[in-house]
Swiss-Prot record:
Residues 40-294 form the CoA carboxyltransferase C-terminal domain. Gene3D superfamilies: 2-enoyl-CoA Hydratase, Chain A, domain 1. This is Acetyl-coenzyme A carboxylase carboxyl transferase subunit alpha. The gene is accA. It catalyses: N(6)-carboxybiotinyl-L-lysyl-[protein] + acetyl-CoA = N(6)-biotinyl-L-lysyl-[protein] + malonyl-CoA. One of its GO terms (biological process) is fatty acid biosynthetic process. PANTHER family: ACETYL-COENZYME A CARBOXYLASE CARBOXYL TRANSFERASE SUBUNIT ALPHA, ACETYL-COENZYME A CARBOXYLASE CARBOXYL TRANSFERASE SUBUNIT ALPHA, CHLOROPLASTIC. The keyword Lipid biosynthesis applies. Pathway: Lipid metabolism; malonyl-CoA biosynthesis; malonyl-CoA from acetyl-CoA: step 1/1. It comes from Prochlorococcus marinus (strain MIT 9312). It is found in: Cytoplasm.
Length: 335
């Protein structure tokens, strides 16, 4: 079993984990019955882990969402897909490995599944570009979604990206146009679309496959217009203020559900999805099946109309009767 990667705020668990491993080694190397001690330590570790994860700040949730052992798109595909055939290429000479897709079936129901894919180590992350898709990735995604629309396949998307790749080559190849085209075309698809934020949901990179009839989020996932680090650098010119930015951006599932941005927050196992990936997979599978059962009862016209309405009402603003009222709400700037 791979060694668990503990985050900074999980450090109180380090000593307990060491003791648990020592007892397990003792049990393997001798005939001493240590089951009672092992049970006590594991129970204590579980209780402390639950206490820690019940009070996570938005900045800490970002760390969980970025955890290197968090289940990825391909992990979930393998967990609950009866069969899976990956489809490649954007039909324009590229095959972006940061955004993958293919046809599979869930309980004998054929679906198109696509999502961002990060790597587990440095070598794989270089191949996957750390989950940051280039224009070709979004064009591949659109090709696959149009294929699904043609053959009446429900679309499942899995969002896990810090953002679309912002390098010079991506701009030269039309990153903005590729994402904008996806947004426009997804509003016109006549099949159900269920999107899930399984890790990071960053900026336009997430939106490029995020126009959906139902948008779900795991409990410790994040969905944001910009990374807190970028936001802090822009607003305060200090990336160290990222924790404050994370709180102000309202990036957690609880906040976004209250704002009407997402439709459901999926609970995670104690310690996050990386501690019990199979439990996370079962939770996601049940949620997807529930929403698909509802959406498949709707006509094509109803799907398009409801999807349009869902996004049309997003966003809020405050009206003031006069300009003085607006300025009175702005704190004075120090010299």
């Amino acid at each position: 079993m791979a060694k668990r990667y503990l985050l900074d705020f999980e450090k109180p668990l380090v000593e307990l984990e060491k003791q648990i491993e020592q007892i397990k080694e003792l049990a393997r190397d001798s005939e001493v019955d240590v089951s009672q001690q092992l049970l006590q330590l594991e129970t204590l570790a579980t209780r402390r882990r639950e206490e820690i994860f019940k009070s996570l700040t938005p900045a800490q949730k970002i760390q969980v969402a970025r955890h290197p052992q968090r289940p990825s798109t391909l992990d979930f595909v393998q967990m609950f897909c009866d069969d899976w055939i990956e489809l490649h290429g954007d039909r324009n000479g590229g095959d972006d490995m940061a955004l993958i897709g293919g046809i599979g079936s869930i309980n004998n129901r054929p679906v198109l599944m696509l999502g961002h894919q990060k790597g587990r180590d440095t070598k794989e992350n270089v191949v996957r570009n750390f989950g940051m898709a280039k224009p070709g990735g979004y064009r591949k995604a659109l090709r696959l979604m149009q294929h699904a629309d043609r053959f009446s396949l429900p679309i499942l998307t899995f969002i896990d990206t810090p953002g679309a790749y912002a390098g010079l080559t991506a701009e030269e190849q039309g990153q903005g146009e590729a994402i904008a085209r996806n947004l426009r075309e997804m509003f016109g698809l006549t099949v159900p679309i269920v999107a899930t934020v399984i890790g990071e949901g960053g900026s336009g990179g997430a939106l490029g496959i995020g126009v959906a009839d139902r948008l779900l989020m795991f409990e410790h996932s994040v969905y944001t217009v910009a990374s807190p680090e970028a936001c802090a650098s822009i607003l305060w010119r200090d990336a160290a203020k990222a924790p404050e930015a994370a709180s102000a951006l309202k990036i957690t599932g609880k906040d976004l559900l209250k704002l009407g941005i997402i439709d459901e927050v999926l609970p995670e196992p104690s310690g996050g999805n990386n501690w019990a990936p199979l439990d996370a997979g079962n939770t996601l599978k049940e949620a997807i099946e529930k929403h698909l059962d509802t959406l498949l009862q709707m006509t094509k016209d109803e799907l398009i109309e409801e999807r349009y309405k869902k996004f049309r009402v997003l966003g809020k603003f405050i009206e003031a009767n006069n300009i003085e009222e607006i300025y009175s709400e702005i704190p004075p700037q120090s010299e």
